[in-house]
Swiss-Prot record:
GO terms for cellular component: cell septum; myosin complex; plasma membrane. It comes from Colletotrichum graminicola (Maize anthracnose fungus). It is an enzyme of class 2 (transferase). Residues 1664-1688 have a biased composition (Polar residues). This is Chitin synthase A. The lineage of its organism: Eukaryota, Fungi, Dikarya, Ascomycota, Pezizomycotina. InterPro entries: Chitin_synth, Cyt_B5-like_heme/steroid-bd, Cyt_B5-like_heme/steroid_sf, DEK_C, Kinesin_motor_dom_sf, Myosin_head_motor_dom-like, Nucleotide-diphossugar_trans, P-loop_NTPase. It comes from the Eukaryota. It is found in: Cell membrane. Polymerizes chitin, a structural polymer of the cell wall and septum, by transferring the sugar moiety of UDP-GlcNAc to the non-reducing end of the growing chitin polymer. Responsible for about 29% of the chitin in conidial walls, is essential for conidial wall strength in media with high water potential and contributes to strength of hyphal tips. Its main location: membrane. Disruption phenotype: Reduces the content of chitin in conidia walls.
Length: 1783
């Protein structure tokens, strides 16, 4: 017989065993039972009637609330399910749990009870129940969800380890009560038919579906219209058929009913509704025939069969039978879905709950047992079944007990008669067909079979109807038998457990909603009636007295099972053993052939059996469950991990109680309990061993990845196989989260911009099935749209905005500007107020005279005004003024080049040439010139005025034109105003003479207006104005200096000044002349964190070697490598953690335990496990301590390709959280306790001493002096919170893609970061090479380890696009942003002297991915920066605002590229004004950059700059565009899916078992160390006194409780005589509250002998070792001795402060003030001797010639780590004077 026994740490606790026999009440009465029921009802707890029966009280209201155990669905007894599970797997016997209802108003508990079982059930099971329930339930006045099935069972098949192997759903043979649920619904209000019909008719149906099915309103169907109730009860808070219909359709789809199957289903349902209309005897014949046609079309059968071969009774029978057959079909599809998922789970391709873990295999794979959870909603049937099992002594186990000689008191005759009456009512459901009800039932079934067979044969051959009625080809109607449960057979072959539900009142369910609380409804009479009806008092008395045996054995079987516990053979041996155990005859009864055991005694024996290996000499906890090949003693499932939240939730069986129970044998207490007996079991491992076999030589990490060379598929030995579906997962429940205001606003904006894109389009065309993915796409589109708008706005502003404000700005020239265009291809002239480009004309021979068009003749005219060279014939341009053809004007200025004068008409010099034509000017010249027109000639308005007023320049402005009549007035003067030349209107001439240089528009308009009344005068005025416009027009006033035209220029000028200033400041910031200063060696403690992921061995070795070789005190730096999961990188032949451990020289046989800690993840991913290794690493003579943390993941992750992987951010948080807890002395997780132990006791440095955290990537090499330079900069400026150095490339010439990055890396640091650093605002401290200060210097306030920083940085639900880009792509930049947010007054600096080299992407794809992360994280960090109150300052006058503007350039990179292209086009095509300013700025940018590396003599960067400029379009256009569009390109997890956001709520579908913080036990270090006798306690406890012991305190003896292995790597051959000194408290006065060594009650218990040192890394400072701050007051020299003792005896402390690794332990004198414990304060404060010694120490170290007394006082207080006030300060001042006087 297979033994299903697990460990003592399984589901069972003392609550499972139950009370012993003597602990039950002697007698139950109705009153005592009623009181007990009332009490448990008020507390929402179950009541244990006997070992196999539990009572609960439920209403629909309690079922809709979350109970004390965190579950919804009502009160249930999870312990009952746990007991049934334990019995099934341990006893290899089938079980049946009957869920009975004592009242028709009781809600169904099937689903919540299933969820409480200690099993991970497949998600498809819950989906199946969700799909089936609408077919079985309907609303009634007494129950909003009344089940109409006779019984519904869920059978779970288990192997003998208790693991699930299969599941199936089945109705009982009684089927469904379709009469009450469909055919004959009561006519009173409140009754409805089965819910599925209302779901069919809701708006959830598509229009096409409704049209195809011919659906109408519910009131139109006879079956549904009887009661007039069509809506669900309004008192239900979630009553909505449409929403329920959506869930129902989704559930159908999930179990495979989709496509044609779904169409067949809804067609059948619609056909049944219509068929119900034919049951009316008064139906019109035509309507009847039409309905039959419709129904036959929907069902696929002959309409004649319905119309002529079926009576009304037959059709009613058909409705009920066909509906039941349809439900059977749905259940069969559900079982197929469950079976398919279980196959996938067994194959390892899918997890049992969608979370990644598959069911582990075991030796009991072939032996299975079944547990059936049987839901019986009918109180009558439930009562008959239960009373038959309890009171009938002629059947079942009762008769077996009596036959075996067990004394059983007979049930009372009244009870027996009532039992028989109850059975008689429902005998046909129990297979009793001899009664009247049985015969009636048999007849009805035969009639149904006949009708169904007739209809089935008339159905079309391929019709769905035929498949429903004949599911097995070749067999007849088998409805009610195939796939059904036989209740009688099931109950007789199983151990039966009863879970009975009571309803507290007969009041209507609607009235419960108005009650003040969910437990207010109570009617003692109602409850009493239910108790008496089921005879529960008699039940309890009978079972507890005689029949409460839950286990029975054959005699030999009992001996065989408990032989290990001392049970001897034979009946006498058993009885003797029972007496030895102290059990009474009532607890264990030895019958004739069998042994009958009560639950408490059975469980006690099983627990002792589980504990038995603890007393044997088996090799460790791994064999506690050797029977099942499970290896851990920590878990409830043998997983090797802490218990999971699936346990008993009763007061005596709660999960917390279980953990408390286990605490007696686990963790620290287990170590104390067993260390004396078995050294091998000193520290139980919690390594994840349940899924794989860890062999020696694997570092305890298993063989995963060792032989697969980077492939992502693994074999079936617990390894990953195939691909997981990243999008679809089942079994989710929905959480509701409140969205903050910013998110709500953003969501509204997103929908405003993208509402026009329908979600179905994204779902089906874009293949975005998930709502959160679609929302991210919408957010991406909105952001891209904004970015496009911003870029377009920038380009528009630069290129077009000015043109819109001033359209012709670039089409206007003044005379001086025209004169600039004098080139052969830039030949401009002005003529008659216009500017012309005749570059293509002047070279042409355009003269028909002897004059040749040569360069010498033409070039002098370039840039000139040509008005005087082309005098027009006056009658031609001034018609109507009576001008003679020979009249000409006298020119005020004589043309310089006579050869260019072109007189035409009668005045032409050569009348035979083309110029001789009278109209040459108007028909030849002017049209030709228009071809070369460029714009207007403009004149400065002020110049026009001053020249007219002061120089008699006779020009005026009229209607926006400038008219120069100087030549006209010169002619009048020369000819003394004779009529022949005085042809203009006198009034107009007078206005000009009176207002030279002014605007005469008003005066001329007045003249025109006055002349309008006189035709002659009007003609004169109009002709004069026409003449002036044709002859004297010289241009327009210069509009380019107007406010409208200058606004944009001034804006651009201001921006240009800002940009030029930034460029100049960047340049100056990068200039650092002179030799590099060599800072003094620093002595601060630094942690060098190296996150490792998939790097190769070469990269890792270079990084670790470079850190080891740093020119820094080896004892004061710690290399902390955090391996992010057990992952095989591309090109590697084994996982990264193994590569790291191999490089560090860790012994492969080392197998530390896997310890739990909280990770950054969603749901259950927050629980992670890690292994800790420590030791010393040597490189080139440098020996440095290291700490390696390998995140190995939960047991369920071991089948995945990346167990333990949570990302780089999690690796950072792991260390930051640890240091935070160290700082606050807060409770730590087991992993953190182990880290503390390794650092404090093994490496030998109190973790609180570390002041800096340097983050270095695993592919980065740091230059030797870099760390010292970083620490020195921080030491010189206490305001620095973060600092970084310059990063260069180590693979600069590997490919074209690395080459284009060289110059960018150089300039981004030496310009961008240097500029930001000037203002202490470096916006991105790169994770590859950055150092953070842990605490402020003055007050010890945490910085990078502050609660706020860690809280915001450790966000787990990264479920929006913004969070993804912040936390998944730009961790380093966001961490800097958080630091800026929380500590705006601190500085974030860059120093170029600290240098490192990293590996740049060598391929385009990797570069693309990297820049996508960088660019998108920059964009999203901008939004975070904008939220900072200190960002802009007053009126934006803030340097951080300038830095923000600099970052803003990332968004407008495409616009920059477009504008550069536009400028190149302008310069090349000469189509516009040459962008001289832009060209100058570009030259300045790159010129200053070039000047930087030229001055720094970095000549190679000249070539790199050229390459970078060639690649500029890639950097500034291709990469940003790609990045912007791929902001939503993520691997979206499927455990938490945001399915909707509306208002201030966010709905999240959670497909995960969730994270229970209680799964990670937390404990303070001091409590942990005290409990496990570890050294290094920090305060409040007596530390190890300095006592000499002969034996040595070995390394193995100071392991933590979690450590069962030696340290990772050691250096042997060192001095073995170093005395161990426990780590002192970082609080300098912690020893004041401790007893001295002589008086301590722990003096002997905690005294520790000397122990072997692993390595000795230097000499011990004797003076420092005797500082008064050490924790050995009993051995501290007296004050009098201190004054004269320059060199204390070595025997007083030399070498005793070394750690397990031989590192000299630093004392308080070497501590930074930042390590002071500000929570505990100064305790009692320093005494006189301490102040004196501090003064002496300061005076020995300072320069007495330069130091002041104030400085000495400050140094003393710093050394004491406290401020002295009052008498203490007076004493210090006096003592300083005394010491100085004695020197």
């Amino acid at each position: 017989m297979a033994n299903g026994r697990m460990s003592m740490y399984s589901v069972a606790s003392e609550g499972l065993g139950g009370p012993r026999a003597g602990q039950q009440p002697s007698q139950f009465s109705t009153t005592t039972l009623l009181n007990a029921i009332h009490n448990i009802y008020l507390s929402s707890q179950p009541f244990k009637l006997d070992a196999g029966t539990s009572l609960v009280v439920n209403t629909w209201l309690t079922a809709s609330q979350t109970g004390p155990d965190g579950r919804t669905g009502g009160t249930i007894d999870a312990a009952l399910g746990a007991r049934a599970w334990e019995h099934a797997r341990r006893r290899a016997e089938d079980g049946c749990i009957v869920l009975g209802s004592l009242h028709t108003s009781c809600p169904s508990l099937l689903t919540p009870f299933l969820s409480s079982l200690p099993l991970s059930l497949p998600s498809s099971l819950y989906k199946s129940l969700e799909a089936i329930q609408p077919f079985l339930r309907c609303s009634t006045p007494y129950n909003p969800s009344t089940p109409r099935q006779i019984a519904l069972g869920v059978t779970l098949t288990l192997n003998l380890t208790g693991s699930l192997r299969g599941a199936a759903i089945a109705l009982s043979q009684g089927g469904i009560d379709s009469t009450k649920g469909l055919l004959n619904i009561p006519v009173e209000a409140g009754y409805r038919a089965f819910d599925v019909f209302y779901y069919l008719l809701t708006s959830a149906s598509t229009p096409a579906e409704r049209e195809f099915l011919g659906l109408k309103s519910a009131s139109s169907y006879a079956l549904l219209a009887k009661s007039g109730t069509y809506e669900p009860p309004s008192y239900l808070p979630t009553a909505d058929d449409a929403a329920a219909a959506d869930d129902f359709r989704s559930a159908l789809k999930d179990i495979g009913i989709k496509g044609s199957a779904h169409r067949n289903l809804i067609s059948t349902l619609a056909g049944l509704l219509k068929l119900g209309d034919t049951l009316d005897y008064n139906l019109d014949e035509d309507v009847f025939d039409e309905i039959c046609e419709d129904v036959s079309g929907l069902l696929g059968m002959d309409p004649e069969t319905l119309a002529t071969q079926c009576t009304t009774e037959d059709r009613a029978t058909l409705v009920g039978g066909l509906y039941e057959a349809l439900v059977d079909w749905v259940i069969s599809k559900a079982n197929e879905a469950i079976s398919a998922q279980m196959v996938r789970i067994r194959d390892g391709t899918e997890s049992i709950g969608g979370g990644g873990a598959r069911t582990p295999t075991s030796n009991g794979e072939d032996d299975t047992v079944c547990i059936t959870i049987l839901d019986i909603p009918d109180p009558t049937l439930g009562k008959a079944l239960a009373m038959r099992g309890v009171f009938d002594d002629t059947l079942g186990i009762n008769s077996e007990m009596i036959a075996d000689g067990v004394e059983v008191s007979a049930a009372g005759s009244t009870v027996v008669r009532e039992m028989q009456a109850a059975i008689g009512e429902v005998g046909h459901e129990l297979g009793i067909m001899t009664s009247a009800t049985g015969r009636d039932r048999q007849h009805a079934l035969e009639k149904r079979e006949e009708v169904l067979e007739k209809i089935g044969h008339s159905a079309d051959e391929d019709a769905f109807l035929k498949k429903l009625l004949f599911p097995i080809t070749g067999q007849g109607i088998d409805l009610g038998r195939a796939g059904r449960l036989d209740l009688s057979s099931l109950l007789s072959s199983s151990r039966v457990w009863y879970h009975l539900s009571i309803h507290p009142t007969d009041d209507s369910p609607a009235s419960l909603a108005a009650l003040p609380s969910i437990n207010s409804a109570w009617s003692a009479g109602t409850v009493s009636r239910q108790l008496r009806s089921w005879r529960l008092p008699e039940w309890a008395n009978r079972r507890n007295k005689n029949l409460d045996f839950t286990a029975d054995f054959d005699i030999d079987e009992f001996v065989q099972r408990y032989a290990l516990l001392g049970c001897k053979d034979g009946r006498e041996g058993i009885e003797t053993w029972i007496l030895e155990r102290g059990w009474t005859n009532g607890e264990v009864v030895v019958g004739k052939e069998r042994v009958w055991v009560r639950e408490s005694a059975w469980w006690e024996a099983e627990s002792m059996l589980d504990m038995k290996p603890l007393d044997s000499n088996l090799p460790g906890m791994g064999n506690v469950m050797a029977v099942n090949n499970l290896e851990s003693g920590y878990s409830a499932n043998g997983s090797g991990y802490f218990p999971t939240p699936m346990l008993d939730t009763t007061p005596n069986g709660s999960r917390d109680h279980l953990i408390a129970h286990q605490r007696n044998f686990s963790q620290g207490n287990l170590s104390q309990h067993t260390l004396a007996h078995n050294a091998a079991m000193r520290a139980p491992s919690v390594a994840p061993s349940g899924m794989r076999n860890v062999q020696a030589g694997d570092y305890g990490l298993g063989t995963k990845g060792d032989t697969f060379k980077g492939q992502v598929f693994y074999n079936n030995e617990g390894e990953f196989v195939g691909q997981m579906d990243p999008e679809i997962a089942d079994g989710k429940h929905v959480e509701e989260k409140t969205m903050d205001k910013d998110r709500r606003i953003w969501v509204a904006i997103v929908w405003f911009w993208t509402f026009w894109i329908p979600s179905p389009l994204l779902s089906f065309v874009g293949r975005m099935k998930r709502p959160d993915v679609r929302m991210a796409w919408r957010e991406k589109l909105t952001l891209v749209w904004f970015i496009v708008l911003i870029n377009a706005a920038i380009v528009f502003w630069i290129v077009a905005f000015g043109k819109i404000l001033c359209p012709n700005f670039d089409k206007a020239w003044n005379a001086k500007e025209v004169a600039y265009h004098t080139g052969e291809n830039d030949f401009y002239v002005s003529f008659r107020g216009g500017v012309y480009d005749i570059s293509k004309f002047w070279k042409i021979q355009h003269s028909d005279t002897a004059i040749e068009t040569t360069k010498e003749n033409m070039m002098p005219f370039a840039g000139l005004n040509m008005d005087d060279y082309f005098p027009p014939p006056l009658p031609l341009v001034c018609p109507g003024l009576g001008i003679a053809p020979t009249t000409t004007l006298q020119y005020n200025n004589t043309p310089e080049y006579v050869i260019g004068i072109h007189k035409s008409g009668i005045l032409a010099d050569d009348r035979t040439s083309a110029l001789g034509a009278t109209d040459w000017y108007s028909t030849k010249l002017l049209p030709k010139m228009r071809e070369f027109y460029k714009g207007d000639l403009v004149w400065d308005k002020a110049f026009i005025n001053s020249d007219g007023q002061n120089n008699d320049h006779m020009w005026v402005i009229y209607n926006g034109g400038v008219y120069d009549l100087t030549n006209y007035f010169k002619t009048l003067k020369v000819f003394q105003r004779v009529d022949s030349v005085n042809f203009l209107n006198a009034d107009i001439v007078s206005a000009i003479e009176s207002n030279p240089g002014e605007d005469v528009t008003d005066s001329w308009d007045e003249i025109v207006k006055t002349a309008a009344n006189n035709a002659t005068e009007n003609a004169s005025v109009q002709n004069s104005l026409n003449c002036i416009k044709n002859l004297f027009y010289v241009g327009i006033p210069d509009f380019r200096y107007s406010a409208r035209c200058q606004t944009n220029n001034y804006i651009m000028l201001a921006m240009t000044i800002i940009l030029c200033s930034v460029i100049l400041v960047k340049f100056l910031a990068a200039l650092q002349f002179g030799s590099k200063r060599r800072p003094a060696p620093q002595d601060k403690f630094v942690i060098c964190q190296v996150p490792a992921y998939t790097e190769g061995e070469d990269s890792l070795r270079k990084a670790l070697d470079s850190l080891t070789a740093l020119q820094y005190d080896n004892k004061r730096k710690l290399i902390c490598v955090i391996c992010d999961g057990i992952i095989v990188g591309a090109g590697n032949d084994r996982p990264t953690p193994k590569i790291v451990l191999d490089i560090l020289g860790v012994d492969p046989k080392v197998d530390p335990p896997a310890l739990p800690f909280k990770s950054v993840g969603t749901g259950s991913e927050q629980l992670n496990y890690g292994k800790v290794y420590s030791g010393l690493y040597e490189f080139e003579g440098n020996v440095v301590p290291y700490l390696v943390v390998v995140k190995c993941g939960k047991e369920s992750e071991q089948t995945k390709s990346k167990p333990g992987n949570r990302g780089k951010r999690d690796s950072q948080i792991l260390l930051m959280s640890f240091l935070n807890r160290v700082h606050h002395r807060a409770p730590m997780s087991p992993l953190e306790l182990e880290m503390f132990h390794q650092i404090n006791n093994i490496i030998g440095v109190d973790p609180e001493l570390y002041e800096y955290l340097m983050m270095v990537d695993a592919d980065t090499c740091v230059r030797e002096d870099s760390l010292n330079r970083l620490v020195s900069a921080c030491a010189n400026d206490a305001k620095i919170a973060g600092i970084c150095g310059e990063t260069g490339l180590q693979n600069d010439d590997k490919s074209w893609w690395t080459m284009i990055q060289v110059y960018e890396y150089f300039i981004s640091h030496n310009l961008a970061k240097a500029f930001e650093s000037l203002f202490g605002s470096v916006t991105c401290l790169p994770g590859c090479f950055t150092m953070y200060r842990l605490r402020t210097v003055d007050k010890g306030k945490p910085l990078i380890i502050a609660d706020g920083v860690i809280r915001d940085y450790a966000v787990c639900d990264v479920d929006t696009l913004h969070k993804k880009n912040l936390l998944s792509l730009g961790e380093d930049r966001y961490l800097t942003t958080l630091m800026t947010k929380y500590f705006p007054s601190m500085k974030y600096k860059f120093i170029p002297d600290a240098y490192c080299q990293t590996a740049a992407p060598e391929s385009w794809s990797v570069l693309l991915s990297q820049r996508r992360r960088w660019i998108n994280s920059t964009i999203h960090n901008l939004f975070e920066l904008m939220k900072l109150k200190e960002m802009c300052g007053f009126c934006c006058f803030s340097m951080r605002f300038v830095v923000f503007i600099d970052l803003f350039g990332t968004i407008i990179l495409p616009a920059t590229t477009i504008y550069l292209g536009y400028m190149i086009y302008l310069a090349a095509s000469s189509t516009g004004q040459f962008p001289i300013i832009s060209i100058i700025m570009l030259a300045a940018v790159y010129g200053l950059q070039a000047l930087i590396f030229i001055l720094k003599r970095q000549w190679q960067h000249i070539g790199w700059m050229i390459i970078y400029i060639m690649a500029f379009p890639i950097y500034s256009f291709a990469l940003p565009i790609y990045s912007f569009w791929n902001q939503d390109n993520f691997s979206w997890g499927n455990t938490r899916i945001v399915i909707g956001e509306k208002g201030n709520k966010q709905l999240v579908a959670v497909d995960d078992e969730g994270f229970d913080p209680r799964s990670i036990p937390l404990q303070r270090w001091d409590d942990y160390a005290m409990a496990n006798n570890l050294p290094g306690r920090r305060g409040g406890y007596m530390e190890k006194a300095d006592m000499g012991y002969d034996d040595q305190y070995e390394m193995d003896e100071i392991r933590s409780v979690y450590s069962s292995v030696r340290q990772g790597s050691v250096l042997t051959g060192m001095n073995r005589n170093n005395t161990y000194m426990p780590p002192q408290s970082p609080a300098p006065f912690g020893h004041m509250v401790r007893a001295s060594g002589a008086a301590s009650p722990y003096h002997h218990d905690q005294a520790m002998a000397n122990r072997q040192s692993m390595a000795s890394l230097g000499t011990h400072d004797i003076n420092r070792g005797q500082t008064p701050f050490q924790d050995f007051p009993s051995s501290r020299p007296s004050v009098s001795n201190l004054r004269g003792q320059a060199n204390p005896s070595p025997g007083l402390g030399a070498n005793r402060s070394q750690s397990a690794l031989g590192l000299n332990r630093p004392h308080a004198a070497a501590q930074s003030t930042s390590s002071f414990d500000f929570q505990r304060g100064n305790m009692q404060g320093p005494d006189d001797s301490m102040i004196i010694e501090a003064i002496q120490g300061v005076l020995r170290e300072v320069d007495l010639d330069t130091v002041t007394k104030k400085q000495v006082r400050a140094l003393v207080e710093q050394r004491l780590q406290t401020g002295l006030v009052g008498e203490r300060r007076t004493f210090m001042d006096r003592q300083i004077d005394n010491e100085l006087a004695n020197m």
